A protein has these predicted regions:
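Cationic, low-complexity basic patches in intrinsically disordered or flexible, solvent-exposed regions
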Residues: 336
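Charge-rich, well-structured scaffold segments of protease-associated domains
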Residues: 1-10, 29, 84-235, 301-329, ...
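His/Glu-rich zincin catalytic helix
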Residues: 1-87, 108, 192-298
Length: 340
């Protein structure tokens, strides 16, 4: 028994980092010009398929346009209702995720390989033939607006938005955020306009990973790679402006009924291509990126101020931030700043 249970008083030996290879995708240009990136790895019969749209929030004409154009893809096509789409994906054990970012939109499908031809056909119909029905749009907008109103009262959301405003500037795309009234301005015309401009074979890239068989590749080529689809036209590149920091070093947001404080500290870091990026990433991890990090052992374990403290790097197009964040009680807020 003593040989099985380790002596917790003795630190385990330190070992060097094992060498490993990062697998690079095989790239195929399909007949319609779309790029397909393939990573064939794993033994389980599971496939992840990603369609990445090369346009996002920086391309929208009004707030929330990119998000809802993406979100509404699953709400109906000319041949399937939203209920039928959900029922079919559920029947075949598939999972679908729709999301958008500053400069991209994403359609992600997880599927068993044996049903992949069926499930990717559903996704292809959603992407190529979305209709943006009025009734479903209103339901989706109302639900998202309600979630926004709830989140807007959370101190962590308030601090996250404010630190972006201070670092980037309130008129910068990364410092501006949707307001409640922006949800009321969304209509099908706006979404169809964004969909028509950016959801086409000339502005999308495909990624597939898992146990990628010849049949999986044939299904992708059949549903996405033969002919051009959508209103193919050149998409003008949009560059983010330079950040315009406000210069304030300490910002306080008052919320009288809050039970906790959310404290965020941040600054600009070198971007991914910089020679010091990886060293700084390791340093940030040592500071607050894992359970035994400096912030965790000092503020949580030693001082007992909180269960939740961390530091990490956040990458945006053209900018990288290093952020430290914590939730604490008001009584310990001022003490904590000096310790961090």
């Amino acid at each position: 028994m003593n040989n099985i249970i380790p002596d917790r008083k003795i630190m385990p030996p330190l070992n060097g980092m094992a060498e490993f290879d990062i697998m690079k995708p095989h790239v195929e240009i399909m007949p319609n010009g779309m790029k397909l990136n393939v990573i064939d790895v794993g033994t389980e019969d599971v496939i992840r398929f990603d369609l990445v749209i090369g346009s996002g929030q920086i391309n929208q004409s009004v707030p929330l346009q990119a998000m809802f154009a993406n979100r509404m893809l699953r709400e109906g096509t000319r041949s399937m209702t939203s209920a039928l789409i959900a029922e079919k994906l559920d029947y075949y054990g598939a999972w679908l995720d729709l999301s958008s970012s500053v400069n991209c939109g994403f359609v992600t499908l997880y599927s068993l390989g044996k049903y992949f031809d069926t499930t990717i056909a559903i996704v292809a119909d959603m992407v190529k033939d979305a209709v943006f029905p009025e009734r479903e749009l209103q339901v989706v907008v109302d639900a998202n607006k309600q979630q926004y109103l709830v989140n807007a009262q959370r101190v962590d959301v308030m601090s996250r938005k404010e630190i972006n405003r201070v670092l980037f500037g309130r008129n910068h795309p990364l410092g501006k955020f949707a307001e409640a009234e922006d949800y009321d301005r969304i209509d099908t015309c706006l979404l169809k306009d964004f969909y028509r401009k950016y959801y086409h074979s000339g502005n999308c890239t495909l990624y597939v990973s898992g146990r990628v068989t010849g049949g999986v590749l044939d299904s992708i080529r059949k549903h996405f790679g033969q002919e051009e689809w959508g209103c193919v036209s050149p998409v003008k590149a949009v560059a983010l402006p330079e950040p315009c920091p406000e210069g304030r070093k300490r910002v306080f947001l008052e919320k009288a009924d809050a039970m906790q404080c959310s404290l965020k500290m941040g600054l600009f870091f070198p971007e991914r291509g910089h020679e010091d990026y990886h060293d700084l990433r390791v340093m940030t991890t040592l500071l607050g990126g894992y359970f035994g990090s400096r912030l965790m052992s000092n503020i949580r374990e030693d001082k007992g101020y909180t269960y939740g403290i961390a530091a990490g790097m956040v990458s945006y197009p053209g900018a990288t931030l290093m952020l430290s964040l914590i939730h604490i009680s008001e009584l310990t807020r001022l003490q904590l700043i000096s310790y961090a």
